[in-house]
Amino acid sequence: MEKSKDELLAGIKTLERVEPFPDEVFYKVFEIEDNVERQKYIEALRNAAREIKRISEFNNLFKQFQLDYIQRMKQSGNKTRFTDQPVELTCGEWNADDMGVRCTRYDKQFQPMQVLACSHPILPVEILKNVDTSEERITLAYYKSAAWQQITVNRSVCANTNKIVDVLSQYGIEVTSDNAKSMVRYISDCVGMNPVVLNPKRSINRLGWMGREFMPYVTDVVYDGGKDFDPVFQNIRHEGSFEAWRTHCADLRKNKIVRMAFAASFASVLIEPLNALPFVFHLWSGESGTAKTVTIMAAMSIWGNPKMGGLVKTMNTTKVGIVRNAAFLYSLPFAGDELQTLKDKWVTNFDQLIYQITEGIDKMRGRANGGVDETKTWRNSFLFTGEEPITKANSRGGSKNRVIEIEVEERLVADGNCTVSVLTENYGHAGEKLIHYLQEVDLQVIRDEYKGYFDAMCHLDTTEKQAMAMSCLLVADRILVEQIFKDEQPFGIEDVKEYLRSAAEVDVAERAYQMVLNWIARNPVRFEDPKAAESLNKGEVWGKILQNEDQPGQSPVAVINKDVLCDYLEQAGFDYAAVSKKWAKKNRLERNSQEKYIHNTKVYGIKANYIKLIMEPNRDPNGFVSVDDMEDEEQMSLPFD
C-alpha cells in the first residue's frame, strides 16, 4: 500500500543509523506538481534527516535521484502527436502536440521550468544525402496558416543557433534567438532517436549521369535541386504521342542541318561515357526567318518540353547564369537562342565564353565565412543560334577548335508554326528510351565505334578536338537511327566532313600571318619612302618591301617596324610572341647575323628595331597575287563571262 507524505516523513524520523532511506521518499518528491508544496516537503525531509544527524547522506542521495530522474525523462519514449502529421517520431523528453514543442527542465534547485522549442507543430521528415558530395540536407515539415508545409535546408542550418534563426524565420517558422538553442536540440533528438524512419535517402541537385544511373530517369534518388532550376526540371518529362513526334521529326530530319542538331543534342549524354570534351554546336545566319530557333527546339524535344524559357534559354543572361545552368544540366544539352545578345558582355568575340563552357568546370569561388564553395562541373554539349558566327577572324585556335559552326543559307523548316505546335504537345519520349538503351548496351562497343570515327577523321585536314566533337555526333546519329528513326541511314564521315574546320582555319599563327599580309596590302603607302619624289606617304613610315628584281621568283620581304607590327597584332587579338615562334618554324622570318629575329637597321634613314617577314612567293610588293600564278580550280568564273 502506497504511503502518504506524512507517513514517509514520520518514517524517516524513526530510522536507525544503519537503515537506508526508503526510495519511496524521493519518488514522492517527483510526484508533487505544485512547486511550493514540493519545496515544503523537501525542506521537511531535510529537517527530519537533520534530526537524526544524517543530513549529508540525505542531500547526496537526493542529488543522485534528481540526476537519475532527469536522465530518465530525457530517455522517455514520448511520441509526436501532431494532427495529420506526415510521420510519427520518438521525441524523448519533448512534448510535441498541436500546441507546439516543449519540455520540462530543472534548475540547480530542482525547480521545473517549461522550455519552448517552437510554438507550432514542426518535425524533421526526411534526410537527403547527396550522391556527389555526401553532404546531407534535412526536410522539415511545419504547420502554419492551417496547412502542413515543407522546407529542405542544409544539416548545418539545424545545428547552428544563428543559422537556424536566419534561415527558418524567412519561411514563417517561429524561431528566435530565445528558442533557437531548444529548436536545435529538439531536431537533433528527433533525428538521433529515429534512425530507421529518418534513414538518409540518396539525393542529387543536378541532372545527368550518376555512374550508370541517369537523373531524372531513376526512381530511388530524390531530386534536391534549387527552385531556380524548377523551370528546367519540370519540363524534362514526356507528353503526348511518341509516334506523332517521331513522324513529324522524321520529316524535319530530311534537312541535313536539322539532323545534325538532333545528333548534337543526343551527343551531349555521350560525352561522359566516351570521355570526350564539351563542345559547341552553333547555327547562324545573317537573315531572320531561317527557323534556327525551331531547329534547336526540335533537337531539345528529345528530352522534354522545348518551349522558350524551359529547355531553350534566351542568351540575354550573365556568365554566371550560363555556368550554373550548365552545371545543373550536367549531361543534358544546354540550348541558347540569339547568341548575339551576349555581344556587349564579351566585347568583340565570344572566345572567353567558349573557353569557359567547354572546359567543363567552373572557377573556384570563396565563401564569405571562409573556405570555398563546391566547384561545379558539367559534361554536356551547347546548342546555340545567332545572327553571326560565334568565332571571328581573330579568335584563338582553342575556341575555333571547340566549335562546330554551320551557316544557315536556306530555311531549315518549312512551317515553323506547325512544328512548334507539334513539338510543344508531343515530346520527351525519345530521351528516356535512348538513356535506357545506353544503360543496357556494352559501352565499350560504343567507345570502339567512336575511336574508329576519331582515328579516321584525324587523317583528314582537321584537328583532334574537331574530330572528337564530330565523332560524338556520328555515334549519336547512328544510335538515333537505330533506336528511333529506323527508316534512315546513319551518317558517315563523308556526310559531315564539310562542317569540319581545316587545320589552317584553327591555326592562330597562320591566320595572323594572312591578316598581316592583308594589312600590308591595305597600307602600301606606309611602306614607301616619304622622301621620294612620287611618294604619297606624308605620314608614318611602318617599313619597306624588299624585292629582288633580278630574281622575280624569290619571295618579297616586308621589313616592318616591330612596335608597329606588335600594336597591329594586339589590336587584332593576336600575341606577337605566340605567333612569331610558329612563323619562325615555317621559315617566314629572317634572322640577323646573331641568329635573332629582331634587326636593328635603317629604313629610309630611320634606325629602329625591325622584323623581316617573308611574304608569299607569288604576292607582289603591293600585296596582290598574279592571276597567272593561280591554280585553275582557284579561279572563279565571272557572271558576265
Show which residues each predicted segment covers:
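Conserved glycine-centered beta->alpha loop in an early N-terminal alpha/beta scaffold
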Residues: 2-8, 34-256, 324-325, 329-332, ...
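DNA transaction DNA-binding modules
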Residues: 32-39, 63-83, 193-252, 445-641
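P-loop NTPase catalytic core of nucleic-acid-dependent motor ATPases
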Residues: 220-308
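Contiguous, well-ordered alpha-helical segments that form the cores/surfaces of helical PPI scaffolds
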Residues: 257-273, 281-282, 293-301, 323-326, ...
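AAA+/P-loop NTPase substrate/partner-engagement loops
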Residues: 295-347
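AAA+/SF3 P-loop NTPase mechanochemical coupling elements
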Residues: 327, 367-384, 399
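Conserved catalytic/switch belt of AAA+ P-loop NTPases
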Residues: 350-365
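Phosphate-sensing "switch" segment of ASCE/P-loop ATPases
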Residues: 376-381, 394-487
